[in-house]
């Protein structure tokens, strides 16, 4: 059985506390003896004055006392200092990825096959290769639709709930692909019509500009005669202008 210290309450506890304080009062109230020499302990460059009668002298450990010899420059270790990293980088206009001109230049000259259907290059390109590329993409999308239909046929052999879910998903994808193909076809047709219209306009301009002759007005004719004949009688007057 463990023994516990007795508990005191009320007046009895007050009397016990008073007697205890009186018993230890003499230990801490003793005057300092001038004959006893005090010791000074230097702990981490902090001077602590400790008397010989002080209770903290027992079991006191001096941690890393600093001596005068260690404070010399030769005793200190020479550690190389790492330069600070700078997070500010001055980019040239050609290396700045946030530059609009740089981005447009890269997109123009980069042969990126994954371009959108309405890219800048395709809108301004009126060559036959561009139309052929669009038709190839339409054919690829039609092949994807055929593949989805084949998957739908294979999935129809499964359970009813799974078959219905797959069928609804495939039908939705098929409708979406059909709309995209229709938009591609309409855009391709519009481009073909625009190319034909521009070709006809250029043909009409070339038909009107078949003559290589240059006609001169009367004043230009007089100037031409003056230069050819070099005659003073053909001098121009203000009335000629």
Curated annotation (Swiss-Prot):
Query: What segment(s) does the record annotate as region Binding to the N-RNA complex?
Result: 232-241
Site annotation (Interaction with protein M2-1) points to 108
Q: Which Pfam families match?
A: Pneumo_phosprot
Q: Where is this region: Binding to monomeric RNA-free nucleoprotein?
A: 1-30
Show the segment(s) annotated as Important for viral particle assembly.
39-57
Q: Which GO terms describe its biological process?
A: symbiont-mediated suppression of host NF-kappaB cascade
UniProt key word Acyltransferase:
no
Q: Listed GO molecular functions?
A: RNA-directed RNA polymerase activity
* Positions of modified residues (Phosphothreonine): 108
Q: Where is this region: Binding to RNA-directed RNA polymerase L?
A: 216-232
Record key words, sorted: Host cytoplasm, Host-virus interaction, Inhibition of host NF-kappa-B by virus, Phosphoprotein, Viral RNA replication, Virion
> Where does the record place the region Binding to protein M2-1?
90-110
Assembly information from the UniProt record? Homotetramer. Interacts with protein M2-1; the interaction between the two tetramers is required for the anti-termination and elongation transcriptional activities of protein M2-1. Interacts with host phosphatase PP1; this interaction recruits PP1 to the inclusion bodies. Formation of a complex PP1/M2-1/P allows P to target host PP1 phosphatase to the M2-1 substrate. Interacts (via C-terminus) with the nucleoprotein N (via N-terminus); the phosphorylated phosphoprotein P binds to N-RNA complex. Interacts (via N-terminus) with the monomeric RNA-free nucleoprotein N.
Q: What name goes with this protein?
A: Phosphoprotein
